[in-house]
Amino acid sequence: MKQLVLASGNAGKLEELRAMLAGLPLRVVAQGELGVEDVPETGLTFVENALIKARHASAVTGLPALADDSGLIVDALDGAPGLYSARYAGSPTNALANNAKLLDAMREVPSDRRSARFYAVIVLLRHPEDPQPLIAEGSWEGVITTQPRGDGGFGYNPVFLDPVYGLTAAEMDTALKNRLSHRAVALATLQHKLHAMSL
């Protein structure tokens, strides 16, 4: 079985990606298991950051690497927190502080203007200098709640409501969330290529 390194130090993201990749004929290994440390995300776009992470993990391990960069885009905040979603309330990353800052920024925003989306870019590099990385993107439309709901998931999940289901991402069971999420959409685009690829 071939190995694929997941270029992330985010435990919640790793768990989600591993579950979504479970059916593939790959041994999925987190970068931390191979001694790879996080690399600074200095890109100006989600794609650039995902490429930076994948190249770093692949260069250190010599393995193909899968990296994701994602964020929450809130229309009433002109796209914030966006690229800086993980560090919205400052460093180090703190989901509770990020959610509190977001809800505070949205305090006066009426219900009909609370639209938002989770957005993800997933990059697969076969080797560090791969001239044709596979890039897929996905989004998940929703609205920002007025208070946190649910205790599942991670990050902004307690404040992101899927209006079709009437549940926040934190209230959904794993199977439903992994079917609807921005990462699931991006991975679905990538999966048929992974099945056919010679890693």
Swiss-Prot record:
Cofactor requirement: Mg(2+)
Mind listing the GO biological process terms from this record?
Answer: nucleotide metabolic process; purine nucleoside triphosphate catabolic process
Q: Which PANTHER family match?
A: INOSINE TRIPHOSPHATE PYROPHOSPHATASE, INOSINE TRIPHOSPHATE PYROPHOSPHATASE/HAM1 PROTEIN
Keywords, A to Z, come to: Hydrolase, Magnesium, Metal-binding, Nucleotide metabolism, Nucleotide-binding
Q: Which NCBIfam families match?
A: RdgB/HAM1 family non-canonical purine NTP pyrophosphatase
* GO molecular function (one): metal ion binding
Pfam families reported in the protein's UniProt record: Ham1p_like
Tell me the cofactor note: Binds 1 Mg(2+) ion per subunit.
Q: Which reaction does it catalyse?
A: XTP + H2O = XMP + diphosphate + H(+); dITP + H2O = dIMP + diphosphate + H(+); ITP + H2O = IMP + diphosphate + H(+)
E.C. number(s) listed in UniProt? 3.6.1.66
Question: Which residues are annotated as active site?
Answer: 69 (proton acceptor)
Q: What interactions and quaternary structure are annotated? A: Homodimer.
What is this protein's name? dITP/XTP pyrophosphatase
